[in-house]
């Protein structure tokens, strides 16, 4: 298994698909990384030589991925909560942040129903 950005990417998959196992790398970014590294999209990871894997590592290293990205996202949410703005309050209360209705839906964000005690 090739190790890129601290993640073991699967050997049996195509390079583009395998790169999406890294948090912060989606389909579009994986294609641009492969193009910049000069690697065809249909090549499997097990068929890459060490120089090509190193080229992928350098291209992935140009982006914010994995732990740094997770930390950045959580710090952004924490900043909103500390500011006390509307979005921060919604995060703090565990409710939808982007204006969705909450009277009937929003079960994913609110969690399972709590029975009313009589």
Curated annotation (Swiss-Prot):
Species assigned in the record: Tolumonas auensis (strain DSM 9187 / NBRC 110442 / TA 4)
Disordered: annotated segments: 94-118
MF GO annotations: rRNA binding; structural constituent of ribosome; tRNA binding
GO biological process: translation
Assembly information from the UniProt record: Part of the 30S ribosomal subunit. Forms a loose heterodimer with protein S19. Forms two bridges to the 50S subunit in the 70S ribosome.
Keyword RNA-binding: yes
Gene Ontology annotations for the cellular component aspect, listed alphabetically: cytosol; small ribosomal subunit
SUPFAM superfamilies: S13-like H2TH domain
Protein name, UniProt field: Small ribosomal subunit protein uS13
Keyword list, A-Z: Ribonucleoprotein, Ribosomal protein, RNA-binding, rRNA-binding, tRNA-binding
Lineage: Bacteria, Pseudomonadati, Pseudomonadota, Gammaproteobacteria, Aeromonadales
Protein's job: Located at the top of the head of the 30S subunit, it contacts several helices of the 16S rRNA. In the 70S ribosome it contacts the 23S rRNA (bridge B1a) and protein L5 of the 50S subunit (bridge B1b), connecting the 2 subunits; these bridges are implicated in subunit movement. Contacts the tRNAs in the A and P-sites.
Family that this chain belongs to: Belongs to the universal ribosomal protein uS13 family.
InterPro entries, sorted: Rbsml_uS13_C, Ribosomal_uS13, Ribosomal_uS13-like_H2TH, Ribosomal_uS13_bac-type, Ribosomal_uS13_CS
